[in-house]
Amino acid sequence: VFYIVEQDSKLESLERLAKLGLYVDVISSNDLYHPKLSSTIAVYIRPVNSKHGFIIPINHDEGLNIPKDRIYGILSSASKLYTVNKKDLLYHFNLQEAIDISLLYSMVKYDRLEYSRENNTLNHFYNKFRDFPNINQLIPISKLYESCEKVYDQVKQVIEYEIPSGFDFYNKTATNVFFLLEQSGIGIHYEAFKKMFTPRNPLFNTVDNTVLTSYNLYNVTSRPTNAFNSVNFAAIPKSPEHRKCFRPTGDYFVELDFDGYHLRLLSEQIDYRLSSDSAHEQLAKIYFNKEEINEDEYKEAKQTNFHAIYGKIPEKWAFLEIFTKIDSYVRELWGRYENDGEILAPISGKPFGRGLKDMNPQKLINYVMQSLETSRNILILKEALRFLKDKKTKLVLYTY
């Protein structure tokens, strides 16, 4: 059949076409399982602007299976390589230069790229055998091919998009950081976790009393979400009953947090100096004109600071240097946004442009600060992962 590539001559032809650029879609053993718990069944490759794609079987009964390293050689020789989810691709092939078109779409359109790979045959098999780990081995390879063709037709226009500022930071640095962060998983007490969190099917992302998470990077501010198998790991309830479901795979869980993080990040942007003491307490001492701050005063100061950053600066304190600088910074950002049509976030260079809906100065500063927080944390995580590479301590979860 023309679309199945098995012979060396066809593989060599595909390798020659790689100089035109390739789109790749990996078919895993089960679409519902975490990619770390799945294997590679086949690979769909489509030369850019070709009228059809090709499917190369790796572990499917209907094909003369091709070694993965042979396919890696073809993909790595592409002048440009596009995929719908680079982080998932990394579980099958270490292709650092791949361009994530879902990320590209989210950075250009400020929205999520929607696509479906369903067809009647896939629906039939998944309705009956969804829990079977190797379900995609059972589905006729022609139907797997059809589903990949369907996805390509829905996303092909994104390949033509111009790469925006900041794309490499998220496509390479962020994608690698969160891919590596997913490798450890979080230790759990299996029965307690299953009872409290009711995952759709625990088999989809649990192994050896460890649950695997999955970060989604395709958000307006680039703040990652982290939900998989009906469990939101970015918003684990703080009740003792929920927290007791987790166990360290080593000796202890250690939680690290930043003091007055957004306040400090914004102070850096406006060149306002805060000491190493509690950021909120430093301003509380000014508000209440005293050196010793009680708990209620601290909470009030924290609320005031939050409103000053993301809402309206209280008139009572508008004269303070930090707030005059914040006001000037917000006005400057908004002026650049209005005049130039976009502003670039610090560190990542991510653009916030006219494609955003219902923008105003407060919304813009909110987006910029969330982006700054995320990009700074990505760099911190990158260094932490590098430091812990040969250590027993593992990073297991990122929240904000």
Regions found by a protein language model. Name each.
Residues 1-119:
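Conserved RNase H-like, two-metal-ion catalytic cores of nucleic-acid enzymes
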Residues 32-40, 45-51, 58-63, 190-295, ...:
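Acidic, glycine-rich two-metal-ion catalytic cores of nucleic acid-processing enzymes
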Residues 90-163, 174-184, 229, 235-361:
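Helical catalytic core of nucleic-acid polymerases
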Residues 167-176, 196:
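Acidic two-metal-ion nuclease catalytic site recognized across multiple nuclease folds
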Residues 169, 181, 185-190:
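Non-catalytic, peripheral interaction segments enriched in hydrophobic/basic residues
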